[in-house]
Curated annotation (Swiss-Prot):
Protein name per the record: Heme exporter protein C
Gene source species: Bradyrhizobium diazoefficiens (strain JCM 10833 / BCRC 13528 / IAM 13628 / NBRC 14792 / USDA 110)
InterPro entries per the UniProt record, alphabetical: Cyt_c_assembly, Cyt_c_biogenesis_CcmC, Cyt_c_biogenesis_CcsA/CcmC
Superkingdom of the organism of origin: Bacteria
GO biological process terms held by the UniProt record: cytochrome complex assembly
Stored Pfam families: Cytochrom_C_asm
Membrane-spanning ranges: 19-39, 61-81, 92-112, 126-146, 157-177, 198-218
Family membership: Belongs to the CcmC/CycZ/HelC family.
GO molecular function: heme binding; heme transmembrane transporter activity
Entry membrane topology: Multi-pass membrane protein
Function: Required for the export of heme to the periplasm for the biogenesis of c-type cytochromes.
Annotated disulfide bonds: none
Keywords: Cell inner membrane, Cell membrane, Cytochrome c-type biogenesis, Membrane, Transmembrane, Transmembrane helix, Transport
This protein's GO CC annotations: plasma membrane
Amino acid sequence: MTLIDLANPTRFLALTARVLPWLAAATVILLAIGLYQSALAPDDYQQGATVKIMFIHVPNAWLSMFVWGVMSIASLGTLVWRHPLADVAAKAAAPIGAAFTFLALLTGSLWGRPMWGTYWEWDARLTSVLILFLMYLGLMALWRAVDDPSRAARAAAVLTLVGAINLPIIKFSVDWWNTLHQPASVMRMGGSSLDKSFLIPLLVMAIAFTLLFVTLHLAAMRNEILRRRVRSLQMMQASRMAFSSEMGAGSRQNNASNEVGAA
């Protein structure tokens, strides 16, 4: 099946109906394995047991940026290729991305309290992630505020692509500025600096959370497609009722005119 085939909403619904149960099962299994391995991971010699917040915080932080990247690609599909499902994909991803970003901020604050002595600092990375969260909320508000779906899709696509400039700022903020966050320890030149007892559970949790996003995203896209179909049917029904009312009114006027003429 090609991308052109997936452009057909009916085929997309049929495919995802078959795939989603398997994705959900894989997500649950990997989450269970990851949580079990995270619980068995040793305490850090400096951070103690609080280091285990990392197994939730890092996947959420990674997905907060990944989801915006997915939305940026979908926005290109809206503006350049006019893919029928591009706006559906972007709109369905926004609430999920906002949730991951909120969880990243929340778990980061809980992790930062014992390490930094405070829940919040106007650190470069913290601030840029907060801006990302606000951008998610802004896009969600835009889709709700604009009644015309095509106008909303184009406006959201432009804002998403403009907002993508924040992604490298988040990623490289620890290198460009003096921040409280440590430099990358998993994906870096020369290999990861994490011990395997931390690295393996972290990677399992990252894959599990990514599968969770894919599962939620496909389910949300299905709901959005069905919602738009219902809205389209409601508009068609309203148009038919309005047309029937006009025809009925016109018929009554003609009958009244004929009666007057006969009299």
